[in-house]
């Protein structure tokens, strides 16, 4: 499940079935909220839809919002987070190594990735924890803030990055790429009909 936006004023929230490859819920939204996702999942369950698992991005609070359903964080979204923090060509060796490790995520096993992240920390923990002092205020702060953010993002999301391994019988996808592809198709189609009113775009 995910939400895509068409401009700044409106978007579409979609809950998509990876097995039947059809949308179970399509909702016009102005803002993407955890409560709205909860409401839509509950509405589907009330209709008798059995939700075996959920694949979503790492939006704050969303991964923890469904304690009774296996939740897989989209590994592609995790990669985007790391690239946003570290860019394509990090300057420090620690950042280059962490980015390289993150790029193995989609092809790695849970145990191998956790081991790789632990080994990275053992090599670079001192660098990660370096502090600098502000000459004007005298206050200290972490020197490599973006590197810390990237590392802690991986560490924080680890419980949900390999849910598909924990429930092999469910054949859980490890990304929302199927839905992202549908969003891409929608946006390309709407570009061909740029003059349509919003109501017609939703239809």
Where are these predicted regions, by residue range?
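Intrinsic structural disorder
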Residues: 17, 21, 46, 77, ...
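A short hydrophobic/aromatic micro-motif that marks alpha-helical segments and, especially, helix-coil
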Residues: 17, 32, 92, 194-195
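Conserved beta-strand -> loop -> alpha-helix junction used to position metal-binding or nucleic-acid-contacting
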Residues: 53-99
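RNase H-like nuclease fold core
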Residues: 1-60, 64-68, 157, 178
């Amino acid at each position: 499940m995910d939400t895509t936006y068409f401009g700044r004023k409106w978007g579409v929230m979609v809950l998509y079935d990876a097995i039947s490859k059809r949308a179970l819920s399509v909702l016009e939204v102005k803002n993407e909220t955890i409560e709205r996702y909860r409401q839509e999942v509950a509405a589907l369950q009330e209709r008798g839809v059995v939700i075996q698992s959920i694949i979503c991005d790492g939006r704050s609070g969303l991964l923890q919002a469904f304690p009774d359903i296996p939740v897989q964080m989209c590994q592609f979204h995790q990669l985007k987070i790391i690239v946003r923090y570290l860019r394509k060509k990090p300057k420090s060796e620690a950042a280059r190594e962490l980015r390289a490790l993150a790029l193995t995520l989609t092809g790695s096993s849970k145990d191998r990735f956790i081991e790789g992240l632990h080994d990275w920390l053992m090599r670079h923990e001192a660098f990660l924890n370096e502090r600098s002092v502000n000459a004007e205020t005298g206050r200290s702060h972490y020197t490599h803030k973006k590197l810390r953010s990237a590392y802690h993002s991986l560490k924080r999301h680890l419980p949900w990055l390999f849910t598909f391994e924990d429930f092999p019988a469910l054949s859980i996808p490890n990304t929302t790429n199927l839905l992202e592809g549908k969003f891409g198709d929608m946006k390309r189609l709407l570009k061909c009909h740029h003059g349509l009113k919003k109501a017609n775009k939703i239809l």
